[in-house]
C-alpha cells in the first residue's frame, strides 16, 4: 500500500515536471547579440503564437544595407535553412519577423545572410536549442 502511494506521488511529480518543462520551452527565448561584419546590433526573440514558431528581431536591430539580406537558421545538427528576405520589394518595408517552417527543429543560431553575394553578414545564438 505504501509503495503504491509512493509510486503515485512520484508519477505526479514527474508529470508536473514534464508539464513545466514543456511550458518553459514554449515561452519566449532571446538570443545573444548579433555579431558580424554587417549585422551587429540587436537580438532575435523566438515565440510560439497560435501554434506557429516565430522569430522577431529587436527594435535596435538594423537590417544591413546589402542587395539581398535574408533570414537563415541553423539547427543543432548543423543544417542550414534559408527563409525569407528581410527586405520587401515594394517600397522600403522590412520583414522584421518570420514564421519558421514546421519541419525546422532545434534552432541554435539565426543568421543574416546576403543571398546575392552568398556571404554571412552576422549571426546570433540561443543558449539552448529552440524546438
Residue spans for each PLM region:
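An anionic, turn-rich surface loop/hairpin at beta-sheet edges
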Residues: 77-105
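Transition segment at domain starts
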Residues: 23-50, 129-131
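Short amphipathic, basic-aromatic surface patches that mediate peripheral association
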Residues: 57-61
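Bacterial N-terminal signal peptides that target proteins for export
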Residues: 1-10
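Beta-strand signatures of extracellular beta-sandwich domains
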Residues: 70-74
Amino acid at each position: 500500500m505504501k509503495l503504491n502511494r509512493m509510486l503515485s506521488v512520484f508519477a505526479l511529480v514527474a508529470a508536473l515536471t514534464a508539464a513545466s518543462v514543456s511550458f518553459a520551452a514554449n515561452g519566449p527565448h532571446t538570443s545573444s547579440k548579433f555579431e558580424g561584419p554587417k549585422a551587429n546590433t540587436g537580438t532575435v526573440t523566438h515565440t510560439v503564437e497560435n501554434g506557429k514558431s516565430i522569430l522577431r528581431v529587436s527594435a535596435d536591430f538594423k537590417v544591413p544595407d546589402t542587395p539581398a539580406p535574408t533570414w537563415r537558421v541553423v539547427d543543432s545538427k548543423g543544417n542550414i535553412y534559408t527563409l525569407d528576405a528581410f527586405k520587401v520589394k515594394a517600397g522600403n518595408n522590412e520583414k522584421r519577423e518570420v514564421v519558421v517552417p514546421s519541419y525546422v527543429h532545434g534552432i541554435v543560431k539565426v543568421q543574416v545572410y546576403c543571398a546575392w553575394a552568398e556571404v554571412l553578414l552576422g549571426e546570433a545564438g540561443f543558449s539552448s536549442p529552440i524546438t
